[in-house]
């Protein structure tokens, strides 16, 4: 069969003509290999660039259960585009997934990322992946693979989207599922580093209304840097705590805030009563509430309000847990207690 004839003056088309630059993709791989190499740990059986990534479950596990999580960064990326600040969203991406699998007692083992854009900017993508690798280092997990998708016409110039995938392992007998939580247990709150990666659609609406100078000083750093502070990763201090005492339950405070995430680990019939005066509301959340006219109840169901992770322990273990986490560099408060629910009551109430 003869190929179709083209017009005499027609030029042959290339993938680059269609908007996809294979050379740019290759250049990105070369740039990110050193970042990924720094995250290598026992169990990694291959390098970046293969069709699939190989990982051997550590032999220390007798009955390993794999725990997986996936997430993105949400509309925090829109603020990153506006500020042309791409160095922190990679850590956000890792944190959202590794903190999620941590609450079941899992040690993060490896991470993969997906970077999608309309036109690939190698420097921007490399900056993002460098942040992802940093997040993996903070989590003790390996960055073993990923996908960069350049899709002309799918995203505006200068914009991209991210997705991350984490896999960890926990000993079957040590899975944390909240089943042992009972009345009298104590809820500890670990400080967040800021807004983390949830609620940014409301944040952006408040910024639109208030029209602040994002470069202005805000309690020692620019408002922009305060808003973009990367999500805190709690993996290492909490894995260490689990080796010393019984952690009955944990809740990563993400979308839905304190009042919708803590109930996810409570059995029916139990309520966590939180004292909103037990920890300080950070200045950034006060600023958001003031400039947005946001009600207290809405703040508690949208933002973390200064608490990025809730940890539930027996009352007898609370002081030891606080001391251990404080020594590891965390700010911790007793923010509430678990009790029997009253009729018709929500499973988490803030008083």
UniProtKB/Swiss-Prot annotation:
EC main group: ligase
Pathway field: Purine metabolism; IMP biosynthesis via de novo pathway; 5-amino-1-(5-phospho-D-ribosyl)imidazole from N(2)-formyl-N(1)-(5-phospho-D-ribosyl)glycinamide: step 2/2
Pfam family, one: AIRS
Keywords: ATP-binding, Cytoplasm, Ligase, Nucleotide-binding, Purine biosynthesis
Gene Ontology CC, one term: cytosol
GO MF assignments: ATP binding; phosphoribosylamine-glycine ligase activity; phosphoribosylformylglycinamidine cyclo-ligase activity
Coiled-coil ranges per UniProt: none
Catalytic activity: 2-formamido-N(1)-(5-O-phospho-beta-D-ribosyl)acetamidine + ATP = 5-amino-1-(5-phospho-beta-D-ribosyl)imidazole + ADP + phosphate + H(+)
Keyword Acetylation found: no
One Gene Ontology biological process: 'de novo' IMP biosynthetic process
EC number(s) recorded for this UniProt protein: 6.3.3.1
Subcellular location: Cytoplasm
Disulfide bonds: none
Main location: cytoplasm
CDD domains documented for this protein: PurM (cd02196)
Similarity comment: Belongs to the AIR synthase family.
NCBIfam families per UniProt: purM
Record protein name field: Phosphoribosylformylglycinamidine cyclo-ligase
Organism: Burkholderia vietnamiensis (strain G4 / LMG 22486) (Burkholderia cepacia (strain R1808))
Gene name per UniProt: purM
């Amino acid at each position: 069969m003869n190929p179709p004839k083209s017009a005499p003056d027609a030029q042959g088309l290339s993938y680059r003509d269609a908007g996809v630059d294979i050379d740019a993709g290759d250049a990105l791989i070369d740039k990110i290999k050193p970042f990924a190499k720094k995250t290598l740990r026992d169990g990694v059986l291959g390098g970046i660039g293969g069709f699939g990534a190989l990982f051997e479950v550590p032999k220390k596990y007798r009955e390993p259960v794999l725990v997986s999580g996936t997430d993105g960064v949400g509309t925090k990326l829109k603020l990153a585009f506006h500020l042309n600040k791409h160095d922190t969203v990679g850590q956000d991406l890792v944190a959202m997934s590794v903190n999620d699998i941590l609450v079941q007692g899992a040690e993060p083992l490896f991470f993969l990322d997906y970077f999608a854009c309309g036109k690939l900017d190698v420097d921007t993508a490399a900056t993002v992946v460098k942040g992802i690798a940093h997040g993996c280092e903070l989590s003790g997990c390996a960055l073993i693979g990923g996908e960069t998708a350049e899709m002309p016409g799918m995203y505006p110039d200068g914009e991209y989207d991210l997705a991350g995938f984490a896999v960890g392992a926990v000993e079957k007998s040590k899975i944390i599922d909240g089943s042992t939580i009972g009345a009298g247990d104590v809820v500890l709150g670990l400080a967040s580093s800021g807004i983390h990666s949830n609620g940014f659609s409301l944040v952006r609406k408040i910024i639109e209304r208030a029209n602040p100078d994002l470069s202005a000083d805000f309690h020692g750093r620019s408002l922009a840097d305060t808003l973009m502070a990367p999500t805190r990763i709690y993996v290492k201090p909490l894995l260490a705590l689990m080796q010393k005492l019984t952690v009955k339950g944990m809740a990563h405070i993400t979308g839905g805030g304190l009042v919708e995430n803590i109930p996810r680990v409570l059995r029916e019939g139990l309520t966590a009563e939180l004292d909103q005066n037990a920890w300080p509301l950070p200045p950034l959340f006060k600023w958001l509430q003031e400039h947005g006219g946001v009600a207290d109840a809405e703040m508690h169901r949208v933002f973390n309000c200064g608490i990025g992770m809730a940890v539930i322990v027996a009352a007898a273990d609370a002081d030891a847990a606080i001391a251990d986490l404080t020594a590891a560099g965390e700010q911790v408060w007793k923010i509430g207690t678990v009790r029997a629910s009253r009729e018709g009551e929500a499973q988490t109430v803030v008083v």
